Amino acid sequence: MNGTARIDVSREQVLRYRVAAQGFDRASTTPGVLALGVQDTPHGSAPIALAARGASSDGLERVWSFRGAPHLHRRTEPAALAAALWPLDDADATARISTAVIKEGAKLGLAAFRVTAEAFRRTVVEPLGKGEVSTAVSAAVPESLTYWCTPCGARHISGLLFQQAGLFGSVRVGSERGKTVLSPLGSPFPVPETASGTQDLVRSYLRFLGPATRAEVAAFLGTRPTAIRPVWPEGLVEVSVDGASGWLPESEVEALRGAPRADAVRLLPPGDPFLQARDRSLLLPDRDRQKELWRAIGGPGAVLAGSEIVGTWRARSAGRRVEVTVTGFDALSASVRRALETEAQTVAEVRGAKEALLRIE
């Protein structure tokens, strides 16, 4: 950090800044927000997030990355990404996998990640189903990293550890007939010895989802705020947003101050980078609407109009077309409705359909 005085901005300025930073103007086919990957939850939704920015999934690889969730990343990045996501120390490693089912095993810290990554490498030498890999890896790691599953009548490795260690095991995450298939990445790399590049990830979060607090960045990484203190970047400016403070790279201050009004209408899938910000009350102040959008299971996508989330949407395939149902939080203007027709067609094309049917509720 430096001595630059704190600046005060409005919520609207922050949202305009994020919309501009994340490439919703479709000015580039390689949006910078790919530095954070694009979460592919539910499966197949990440290409919709990319299309909202004028990009495609060409040249991208699907891996388990942040918090063990499936993300699309540039195919050239897995080795560097693995080094950046490798826990900073034992305490950080324990925080990332701490769960009731492996309370003692989590205390192994970095060793838990290393032994699991090595088990992945010995197991995944060809495409295998996730269940088959889980069985083999579970048998190869210390018992303290597994738990008894009564319905299965077997011990399973903690899912939180399993998916976070997959990238370190140089594993690609695919799908075949609706089932997860794991296979070796095309360009294998060694298990990281130490973390490297974590500070760049922190800076990327602050650039695309800032201003943000240390706690918000830590939550995105799946760890505790104290863990990332050693990699908290220099060159940040404190920003007060309607009284709440966060941090932004000094290089982005002018972009924040001069962020233009956003006019685009976009359909964002549930895992869209814009929705990954941990300050949900800033994105959507109404608590009831927050609950409607960010559901633990089966949540809808978000309708972005300008810089505001104005509703939710869902899509389902019906023959050779896709039916897109939009539910506005309030009445949608005629211009937004017209734009939604185009965006619904974009969703249909991404999903391989020829036609879109838009319903607005």
Show the residue positions of the predicted features.
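Phosphate-backbone binding and catalysis cores of DNA-processing enzymes
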Residues: 1-147
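A short, conserved structural fragment
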Residues: 58-65, 167-175, 236-241, 311
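Short, leucine-enriched amphipathic alpha-helices that occur as contiguous helical runs
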Residues: 113-117, 130, 134, 158, ...
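A short acidic, leucine-rich amphipathic alpha-helix
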Residues: 132-138, 214-218, 307
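Loop-centered beta-sheet repeat module
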Residues: 151-230
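Anionic-ligand-binding alpha/beta catalytic cores of soluble enzymes and soluble regulatory domains
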Residues: 210-256
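Non-catalytic regulatory appendages
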Residues: 236-288
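Glycine-rich, small/acidic residue-mixed loop/short-helix segments
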Residues: 287, 292-361
